[in-house]
Amino acid sequence: MSDILNTILARKADEVAERSARVPLAELIARSADLPLTRGFAAAMQASIAAGDPAVIAEVKKASPSKGVIRPDFQPADIAVSYEFGGATCLSVLTDVDFFQGSDAYLRQARDACTLPVLRKDFTVDPYQVYEARVLGADCILLIVSALEDAQLADLSGLAMQLGLDVLVEVHDIDELERAVQVPVPLIGINNRNLRTFEVTLQTTLDMRAAVPRDRVLVTESGIVTQADVQLMRSHDVNAFLVGETFMRAAEPGESLRQLFFAHD
């Protein structure tokens, strides 16, 4: 399979140039100056875990490069309401247009419809996108270690924290994890999907979890489909989850979430 991530990153560089030509960075910086406080993404995750509950980041995702359109009848506001009712701790909303058929408008619609903190799920490679996320109303951004140099990781995470945004730093292997723990953010995501091949195995999280510092929240991402998957993770003290496709294929995403994570309660 072709290297999807490199293709996406090349497009992101062009996208940033196009967007900054329309809305200059100086304007975004000015607009980010006096915004309300964010909803506290990391704090919400920590609170759910402290209460003994699974901390679920429920994803609002229409499509993906590997699966095509996942949810043809895609209503972000309705999905957000359903997720909140189903017990989600936070939301993740895809805003990448070209590869995931996402939209900035989807993030606004989802966030306005609920009280949950929201992650802007995109490929952040430039400070422009961090300011953009804050202005859009995001509470957290994603930084993918395999897409960034160490200096970029430090600069982008530092800028995000300066703007009041939380950061989820995503890794896929132990070398990336060693780089990620140098970034002083509380959320580390282990993606069970290899972003270069899009293949998935839960063993990725199990193999790496012991190397995640105890003061960080380990979020397992991708491949959580059954209650047995959830129980496997929780039996290994992995209590934070990012789940998208499983819910997006259900008629009622929030009910699917409740069944997967809370049906035993």
UniProtKB/Swiss-Prot annotation:
What's the Enzyme Commission number for this chain? 4.1.1.48
User: One GO biological process from the UniProt record?
Assistant: L-tryptophan biosynthetic process
Give coiled-coil spans as residue ranges. Answer: none
Quote the catalytic activity from the record.
1-(2-carboxyphenylamino)-1-deoxy-D-ribulose 5-phosphate + H(+) = (1S,2R)-1-C-(indol-3-yl)glycerol 3-phosphate + CO2 + H2O
An annotated Gene Ontology molecular function? phosphoribosylanthranilate isomerase activity
Q: Which domain of life is it from?
A: Bacteria
* PROSITE patterns attached to this UniProt entry: IGPS (PS00614)
Q: What class of enzyme is it?
A: lyase
Pathway assignment: Amino-acid biosynthesis; L-tryptophan biosynthesis; L-tryptophan from chorismate: step 4/5
The protein depicted here goes by the name Indole-3-glycerol phosphate synthase
Q: Which organism is it from?
A: Xanthomonas euvesicatoria pv. vesicatoria (strain 85-10) (Xanthomonas campestris pv. vesicatoria)
Q: What gene is behind this protein?
A: trpC
